[in-house]
Amino acid sequence: VTTTDATRDTGRQPRLQADHDAPDATGPDRATALLAAMTLDEKAAQLVGYWLDQTGVVAPMQGEMAAAADGRTLADITRDGIGQFTRVYGTRPVEPDDRAAWLWAEQRRLKRETRLGIPALVHEECLTGLAAWKAATFPTPLAWGAAFDPALVEQVGAAIGASMRQLGVHQGLAPVLDVVRDPRWGRVDECIGEDPYLVGTVGTAYVRGLQAAGVDATLKHFLGYSASQAGRNHAPVHVGAREVADVYLPPFVMALRDGGARSVMNSYAEIDGVPVAANGELLTGLLRDDLGFDGTVVADYFSVAFLEVMHGIAADRGDAAALALEAGIDVELPTGDAYLAPLVERVRSGLVDETLVDRAVLRVLRQKERLGLLDPQAFEDEPPTGIDLDTPLHRSLAKQLAARSLVLLSNHDVPAGTPVLPLRAGASVAVIGPNADRAEALQGCYSFANHVLASHPDLPLGFAIPTVREAMVDALGDDAVRSAAGCAVTGSDRAGFADAVAVAAASDVAVVVVGDQAGLFGRGTVGEGNDTESLDLPGVQRSLVEAVVATGTPTVMVLLTGRPYAIGWALDGDAGADHGAGGSLRPAAVVQAFFPGEEGGTAIADLLTGAASPSGRLPVSLPRAAGAQPYTYLHPRLGGPSDVTAADSTPVRPFGFGLGYTTFAYEELTVDASVPSDGWFDASVTVRNTGAHAGEDVVQLYGHDVHGSVTRPEVQLLGYARVALAAGESTRVRFRVPVQRFAFTDRRMRRVVEPGDVQVWVASHAAASRPGGTVPAGGIVASGGGAVRRPVPGSATSRATVEVTGPVHEVTLDDPRVVEWEVG
């Protein structure tokens, strides 16, 4: 080992040459060689992040948990090295060029001035695009689910990853693979949907895209976070092991095994009294031993310290560090509150085995080695300049994803005898509502605008985001559009109603844009920490819509939200009331947009004017009431409405629902008669565009296990395909289905496929069923309390029966999980 004069008399270990020539740092296993040369302090330093800018509120209890400033320089703080830099671009607004220059210089300093010369890994949030100033904002993940288009999401992930890698960022804290169960939870907009297969296929596509650009994806939140009690953030999770295995785990299995995800983040929650951050059965036994994961597990921000201050299972930070490290958390984020001095003291006193530290450090070093951080030339090039984080490619992809995510929920005839949408040429339009002219309303909780920039109100967004009003003016001309806000998103002030009503009455059509404001921890109506007890639209927005409808002007309600709301009044009216003049409560049309991002306003204008046809489908059920939650369409027979309860959990609109400007029919379903329990079967259907306009359909293949050894869902999405057809055109869609799609966890807690009959059919949504088709018989009827229910539009084939033959098949990780499909 070569020493330098600067370290000879410091009492510290001699400094290694920065090119890693010693010890064997250019050999086949540089990580192992570096680990062998490390002091305990240097090891601990690799297991933590350092947060340079702890301003604003972007993490739970950030103010309480933030380390006190100690006056030391960054060089002194990182004298032993550092594992990660926390959000150097994403904590406050910084010019990308300036920050890149700083980062390159800082990485070179780490290489030259620390003994081991190891650069820091840089992580950033990237759920709706890189969460940095002037970076493109894509639709929120709930919109990814609504698009039912994994290939497009993969392209979006690749574009996000390219921006991050250009800036010297190595790890992205996305995607969220939590399965939605309760729309009252504030973090629903970060999720993809309520179906594990949809979450898994779309989430895996994002992982592939991000990692193809050289950025490690981080799967979160492992495991069961979205099942928190009553939709309350961080609340205890009370789900059984079978539900964990069959609902919450499959998306992670897909993203790990099929997507090759390289990092995982723990859930904040506790399951059956054990916080996940201290649960070795999950983080090591399940994740590593059973699933074969060999990447890094990073702590959700402050979750190691939360073992002490929130969960109360650790006496102090050192105790928390010991619990988390033993459970399997390799890296403490965002800072080293527990894994630095408290952990080092525990190791030196013999209370923690140093081999646990070595295990985590080796994983970190191997990640850095794979990402090129141990290469001699790392950060020796010039930092990027003229950085553009919102290129034409970003905007094109953002618009495509936004357009495919918009869900048309209703579109009734107006007195002229035609549906109100698309708007007729030459119509004057009133654009009304609290979200009609606010760029923030188009963006999700983890967008930079709502996550960080809300704490810097004097700064601009940094790039163009046309609002719905601005996009309508662009589409129709200034003279054709009138506008009024009417009210705010929250509060009870109705002073603006009169202006809104006047503008609507003077127009041919009114477009009322309502919904949410995303934010964190009380700053907004949805987002992290913004859970709700009610699923009514916030504030007086419903009253605003009703006041506009009462003018008699045909009214389109556009929802810009991060969760599904209980809007049965807008879709079905009260007790059978129809749309029309005379004070009816029901708008002529309703469009659901889950925070559609920077091109969302333009995509909405295109849909309203007919420049694009709606093709999004609901990734979550639209709830009837808050009291019916939690809910999922994936329920067994007694999980739905029945004659043994007066409560009706039937959603207002089901999973997979969505209308267009044309209609589709499904014909000639053919399905293999039998399949071995470890095999594949084919299902083919003709899809016909029966309307007068071109359009895209999401063809949904559903199934039902008729008799299982445990209760099974009445309806289960098996696979899906997006198909574009001209008016009158038809095509054949073939699904190739691994019978593993019917797998479940049996009474012995094995994941199996059992022999017996299963039903298979194609439908336009989860509740669509052909009249006279095969349905369960006897005893199960919706009571509904006598409420009038309008039928939900939809079409379906009859159900075909497939016999699964052979012995019980115990599913392995090598079994196929994904349905293949082809068109033509």
Model-predicted segments: where are they?
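Terminal connector regions
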Residues: 738-815, 820
